[in-house]
Amino acid sequence: MTNQQGRLRTRVAVFACVAAAALIVDQLTKAWAMAALSNGQTIRVIPGLLSFTLVRNPGASLGMGSGATWVISLLAVVACVALAVAGVRTISMKWSVALSFAFAGALGNLIDRVMYADGFLNGKVVDFLNYGWSVGNVADIYLVVAGVVLVILILMGEPFSHKDLIEQSDESLQSEPEADAK
């Protein structure tokens, strides 16, 4: 096995393990919420900031798109495939970990849409983390955090692929003679 193949296997293993662990946490917290909050009760955790309230959300973030649940579900399928492919193709462990959390979040909510469906891809996501202005779940937290981390990686110039790495090397080589001339 070459060094490059070994690094690829490591990234794939990390992606799979992080995504699986995150997905398990998401699904266990939703199972707890459905069992503990099924009678419509609210549990106050931090008064004014966080409570647990069970909500079945047919839409996307903040309940948007509740009339187009199947479209949201199809987009989630596409997102899961794209995130898995990107997570395996990247050369960066940082990108791989961030993408694994995004994948776990997208897949966690997609699982809800399939398991709690009124028809083909017409299900509802289990939300229970009530912030007062929004109700979400652990998968939503993964998606938000992954999004922030991905933006940071882009802004930091973290190479995603070999092409990015080569372009960065070429740019640094081109800027060195300019620096030497000054």
Curated annotation (Swiss-Prot):
EC number per UniProt: 3.4.23.36
Cysteine pairings via disulfide bonds: none
Annotated TM spans: 12-32, 68-88, 91-111, 135-155
Any one Pfam family match given in the protein's UniProt record, by short name: Peptidase_A8
Location(s), subcellular: Cell membrane
GO BP of this protein: proteolysis
Active site: 127, 140
Gene Ontology molecular-function annotations: aspartic-type endopeptidase activity
Main location: membrane
GO cellular component, as recorded: plasma membrane
Reaction equation(s) it catalyzes: Release of signal peptides from bacterial membrane prolipoproteins. Hydrolyzes -Xaa-Yaa-Zaa-|-(S,diacylglyceryl)Cys-, in which Xaa is hydrophobic (preferably Leu), and Yaa (Ala or Ser) and Zaa (Gly or Ala) have small, neutral side chains
Pathway(s) it belongs to: Protein modification; lipoprotein biosynthesis (signal peptide cleavage)
HAMAP family: LspA
Record-linked PANTHER family: LIPOPROTEIN SIGNAL PEPTIDASE
Protein name (Swiss-Prot/TrEMBL): Lipoprotein signal peptidase
Organism encoding this protein: Bifidobacterium longum subsp. infantis (strain ATCC 15697 / DSM 20088 / JCM 1222 / NCTC 11817 / S12)
Gene: lspA
